[in-house]
């Protein structure tokens, strides 16, 4: 079933992360001996749909000390999204305002297929983790509303401190910063799902930011053929949690009602 479309969606970024095993060297260093060739071959395969390559500053860090660090970006247009990023042991697919599930799913499946097609020695490509991450944010004036009151009223999350902690105290009731996180085991797909809420800023305005992350490692499907099933199952959970959390006033606000 396609995901609901929100006119004013709170999405900051949707990210797919694919990690693969690196070769250990002296000390704690890890390298992908095929990275340079992989990058060139991915360039050839991505250029049609992502014609704007962008070398990141960390590209100049030696590969021996830059494991799992993205170094090259491929954009659909200048300063535009979506994009794909590559580094030793890592590939990501990222989207922001233009995100739709159908498009993101298609791009993610295609990117994983291209990774396997481009990897110089595909038999040695050992995928170690798959991660689907959603970052959302909603503007909140925390000078007028306590963060746990907002969480309780708008997102159905009960978390608070007893009022008597602040009785006859010089400690202010409004927290300077708030961070809450929980991680749960997941059976389908096999892995864990985490939910994190923090106070921060979006576009210069005080906001509540939350991340919903489905991460699988170890027991992974056969790739690349099994990837579509994995991302569908991961999205089914993250999407279900998102809409259950915002049900009510926030969903109406994000829908533009």
Regions found by a protein language model. Give the residues of each.
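N-terminal low-complexity, intrinsically disordered segments
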Residues: 1-86, 257
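Aromatic/basic-lined ligand-recognition segments
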Residues: 1-3, 70-75, 126-203, 213
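Glycine-rich, often proline-containing surface loops adjacent to acidic residues and nearby aromatics
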Residues: 10-17, 82-98, 126-135, 204-219
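Short, highly charged C-terminal tails/helix-capping segments
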Residues: 124-135, 248-257
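Hydrophobic alpha-helical segments and helix pairs
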Residues: 79-119
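Short, solvent-exposed segments of well-ordered alpha helices
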Residues: 3, 95-99, 225, 229
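Extended intrinsically disordered, low-complexity coil regions enriched in Ser, Thr, Gly, Ala
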Residues: 26-48, 102-124, 220-237, 242
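Long, compositionally biased interface segments
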Residues: 205-257
């Amino acid at each position: 079933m396609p995901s609901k479309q929100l006119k004013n969606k709170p999405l900051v970024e949707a990210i797919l992360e694919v990690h693969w095993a690196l070769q250990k060297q002296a000390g704690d260093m890890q390298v992908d001996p095929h990275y340079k060739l992989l990058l060139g071959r991915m360039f050839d395969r991505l250029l049609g749909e992502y014609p704007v390559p962008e070398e990141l500053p960390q590209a100049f860090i030696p590969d021996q000390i830059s494991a799992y660090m993205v170094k090259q970006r491929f954009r659909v247009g200048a300063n535009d999204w979506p994009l794909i990023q590559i580094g030793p042991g890592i590939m990501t697919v990222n989207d922001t305002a233009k995100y739709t599930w159908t498009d993101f799913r298609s791009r993610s499946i295609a990117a994983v297929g291209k990774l396997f097609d481009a990897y110089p020695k595909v038999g040695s490509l050992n995928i170690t983790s798959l991660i689907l991450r959603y970052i959302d944010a909603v503007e909140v004036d925390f000078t007028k509303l306590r963060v746990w009151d907002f969480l309780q009223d708008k997102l159905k999350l009960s978390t608070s401190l007893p009022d008597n902690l602040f009785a006859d105290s010089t400690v202010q009731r409004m927290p300077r910063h708030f961070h809450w996180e929980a991680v749960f085991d997941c059976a389908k797909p096999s892995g864990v799902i985490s939910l994190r809420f923090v106070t921060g800023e979006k576009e210069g305005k005080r906001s509540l930011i939350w991340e919903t992350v489905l991460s699988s490692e170890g027991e992974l499907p056969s790739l690349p053929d099994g990837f579509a099933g994995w991302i569908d199952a991961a999205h089914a959970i993250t999407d279900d949690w998102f809409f259950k959390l915002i049900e009510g006033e926030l969903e109406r606000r994000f829908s533009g009602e």
